[in-house]
Amino acid sequence: SVGCDSEEGFDLAVRHLMRLGHRKIGLISGPLDSYILKARYHAYLEALDKHGLEINENFIGLGYYVAESTRTYIPKLLKEGVTAILFSHDIRAISAITECDDRDIRIPEDLSIIGFDDLPMTSFTTPPLTTIRQDRIALGKCGFYALSCLLNHVAIGSILLRASLIIRESTGP
């Protein structure tokens, strides 16, 4: 398998948010029915635990439909005192920007948000989205290499690529 190091990505994101003063950090994700979403969910829990932050099930929102889950969970997480939310994918974070704008919730003044993937559109949102970057070109090259190995009956292990945090304007103190 080929993938991005979710643990490293969430660790970078939580450290960044802690430097900004955040201590109640939530997660909004899709349902935990895929390997990637499970890995990102566990990476979130690991990062909170590593940095001594509260792990609270009320800080987590899991939902299949993107717009519906942001509409449902953003108010719930804010009522719980969450000041920053990590998202399993950039699309969910972009949906959150729209939802927050509709509710007059200012980003990053009222709520900091971080996505995951670094899709090209994230630098054009208002505000531009802070996100955990997966190097899509490197993922593609490694995927091609892994497929070539399999086709040639060469055994390989998992390939895990480094994550990086792209700091833009959706996070603040």
Language-model segments: residues:
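Bacterial carbohydrate/catabolite-sensing allosteric modules
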Residues: 1-173
